[in-house]
UniProtKB/Swiss-Prot annotation:
Designated name of the protein: Ribosomal RNA large subunit methyltransferase M
Keyword Methyltransferase set for record: yes
GO BP annotations, alphabetical order: methylation; rRNA processing
Species lineage: Bacteria, Pseudomonadati, Pseudomonadota, Gammaproteobacteria, Methylococcales
Family per record: Belongs to the class I-like SAM-binding methyltransferase superfamily. RNA methyltransferase RlmE family. RlmM subfamily.
Length: 352
C-alpha cells in the first residue's frame, strides 16, 4: 500500500492562515515534519509531509476533534494534475487502490467557494460512472475508510480517505440544516450544529425536563433549540423574546445583564451567544464552571480581525487555568462551525 503524502483540510474561506497554523502545531507535536500550502480565500489547506511513512505511522496521534478551523481532514495523495479528459477514471482508481483496499462510500467534493461551486455540474455528471468503476473498491462496511475526491478543476484533484470515527460525517464537512419556519432567527442553526458536533450522547445530554440558561437570548434562536427538546430555559436578555417561546410554558424571560446573572441552583446547560470580547466570554464561562453552575456549556467567541487562532488559544488558556486552579475536571473543545462567521463555538463539559 502507498502512504498518504499529505493532509487536506477544508475550512471557511478567509481562515486558511488559521487552519494552516493549527495543523502545523498538531503535526509538530506528533513529530511529523512538513510544510503547508495555503492560498488565501481558497477554503482549503494542504499539509505536505516530508516523510510520508512517518505521517502514516503517526496519523493516529492527529485527532480531528482537536482541530478548530478544519471542517474536514483527509489523508491524501496528490494532487493528480492533468487528468486525461477522455479517461479521468483510471488514474483516480489506481491512486485509490494504492491507498486502501476497501472503502465504505465515495464522496466527490469541491472547496466551499463560489468559484469551486462552478464544478458542481461536472461532479454530478462524473459521480455515477466513477462510482460504477470503483464498485470493486467500495462496500467495505460502515467502519471502512471513506473515499474522497476533491476536485480543484475538472482535470486536477486530490484523492484521499477519512476514518468514520475521526472525521466529519458530512460531505465537505458541512451539515445541511434547514431553517425552521418557526425559529426566531437564523442563529438557531448555530446551536443545532453545535449539538451535532459536540454532543455524543444526546439521549442523556439533551433529555426532556433538563434545565438551561440562555445568556443574550433575544430574539430566541438558541432558546428555540432548547424548547424544541423540552428543556426548561431561563432566557436572559434586555431585548424582546419571540412570544411563541413564552407561550410554550418552558421559558422564563429575565430582562437583566447576562454578565451579572447567576442561577439560584445549578443548571444542566449554559448557552451563550452574546456579542462581547472573546476573553470576557471565556472568563464568564470559566466563572460559571468554577462554581459548578452547569454540566454542559455551548458558547460563541466573536474573533478579532487579526491573530484569530492565537485569540482562541488565549481564551482556552483562561478557562483551563481557572478550572485547574479549582481542581475542576472537564473537557473543552472549540470548532468553527459552518454556521459560524467571524467566530468559533466552544463546548465545555464538567466531568464528575
Amino acid at each position: 500500500m502507498t502512504s498518504p503524502s499529505s493532509i487536506l483540510l477544508y475550512c471557511r474561506r478567509g481562515f486558511e492562515k488559521e487552519c494552516a497554523a493549527e495543523i502545523l502545531v498538531q503535526t509538530q507535536a506528533a513529530g511529523i515534519s512538513g510544510h503547508v500550502r495555503a492560498k488565501e480565500n481558497s477554503a482549503y489547506v494542504v499539509f505536505v509531509a516530508h516523510e510520508p511513512e512517518i505521517l502514516a505511522n503517526r496519523a493516529a496521534r492527529l485527532r480531528f476533534d482537536a482541530l478548530i478551523f478544519a471542517r474536514q481532514r483527509i489523508f491524501a495523495s496528490g494532487p493528480l494534475a492533468d487528468l486525461p479528459v477522455d479517461d479521468r477514471i483510471t488514474p483516480l482508481l489506481d491512486t485509490a487502490a494504492g491507498l486502501q483496499r476497501r472503502y465504505s462510500t465515495l464522496w466527490l467534493e469541491t472547496a466551499d467557494t463560489n468559484e469551486a461551486k462552478e464544478l458542481a455540474a461536472f461532479t454530478r455528471k462524473f459521480e455515477r460512472p466513477f462510482a460504477a468503476a470503483a464498485a470493486g473498491l467500495l462496500g467495505g462496511g460502515p467502519q471502512a475508510p471513506r473515499l474522497h475526491v476533491f476536485f480543484l478543476t475538472s482535470t486536477a484533484a486530490y484523492l484521499g480517505y477519512t476514518l468514520p470515527d475521526d472525521s466529519a460525517p458530512w460531505p465537505c464537512g458541512i451539515p445541511r440544516l434547514k431553517l425552521p419556519r418557526s425559529a426566531p432567527s437564523r442563529s438557531t442553526l448555530k446551536l443545532e450544529e453545535a449539538f451535532l458536533v459536540f454532543v455524543d450522547r444526546p439521549e442523556t445530554m439533551l433529555r426532556p425536563g433538563m434545565s438551561a440558561v440562555d445568556l443574550g437570548a433575544a430574539p430566541g434562536g438558541w432558546t428555540w433549540q432548547l424548547v424544541r427538546r423540552h428543556i426548561r430555559t431561563t432566557a436572559v436578555d434586555n431585548g424582546n423574546l419571540d412570544p411563541a417561546l413564552l407561550d410554550s410554558g418552558l421559558v422564563t424571560h429575565l430582562r437583566t445583564d447576562g454578565f451579572r446573572f447567576r442561577p439560584s441552583r445549578p443548571v444542566d446547560w449554559l448557552v451563550c451567544d452574546m456579542v462581547e470580547q472573546p476573553s470576557r466570554i471565556a472568563r464568564l464561562v470559566a466563572d460559571w464552571a468554577a462554581d459548578g453552575a452547569f454540566r454542559y456549556a455551548v458558547f460563541n467567541l466573536k474573533l478579532p480581525m487579526n491573530r484569530r487562532y492565537e485569540e482562541v488559544e488565549r481564551c482556552r488558556g483562561l478557562i483551563e487555568e481557572r478550572l485547574a486552579a479549582q481542581g475542576v475536571s472537564h473537557r473543552l473543545r472549540f470548532r468553527q462551525l459552518y454556521h459560524d462567521r467571524e467566530e468559533v463555538t466552544g463546548f465545555l463539559e464538567l466531568v464528575s
